[in-house]
Regions:
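Low-complexity intrinsically disordered segments
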Residues: 1-15, 136-145
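Short amphipathic alpha-helical surface micro-motifs
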Residues: 1-4, 12-19, 57-63, 113-114
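Long, acidic, intrinsically disordered low-complexity segments
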Residues: 9-32
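Short, surface-exposed, charged amphipathic helix/loop patches that serve as local interaction elements
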Residues: 25-32, 36-145
């Protein structure tokens, strides 16, 4: 059991837990990248970063008001993309410059994701990240494990 715990804890760096995502439109491969599973803390960090908080005067504390879903999804995709692919795609300064020259406002890797992935493509990538991260595993599979 101890060895199993140790191996299970390494899911974020385990290459067997990764999946290649290909962005194909009209039969043409535009680009591809590899994603990995995320831990709860990574999901939470992305959510907090893109949630607007307001101070509740009655309770004297900040409460979440609204989460920017578009930025949140892009942050999840960015976080789940392996480092090598993040550097080649989302953080590539040449890509930023070219997109800026086309009139798109690129300030960071999240902006590249927003402009380069269609809404439905982002949803599908998020689904794959969730599956890799252990969401939507059937009860039967959990019982087997």
């Amino acid at each position: 059991f101890i060895q199993g715990l140790i191996e299970a804890a390494g899911f974020a760096t385990n290459e067997d837990e990764r999946k290649r995502i290909e962005i194909v439109r009209n039969g043409r491969l535009f680009f591809a990248f590899t994603i990995r599973p995320l831990c709860s803390e990574e999901y939470d960090t992305c959510k907090k970063k893109h949630t607007k908080y307001v101070r509740n005067k009655q309770l004297g504390m900040k409460l979440p008001e609204d989460t920017n879903r578009v930025k949140y999804q892009s942050a999840i995709i960015y976080q789940a993309t392996i480092k090598e692919d993040r550097e080649k795609l989302w953080d590539n300064k040449k890509v930023w410059a070219t997109l800026n020259d086309q009139g798109l406002q690129i300030m960071n890797g999240l902006d590249v994701i927003e402009y380069c992935l269609k809404a439905g493509e982002k949803d599908k990538v998020i689904e794959e990240i969730d599956l890799l991260s252990g969401f939507e595993i059937g009860l039967e599979e959990v019982a087997k494990n």
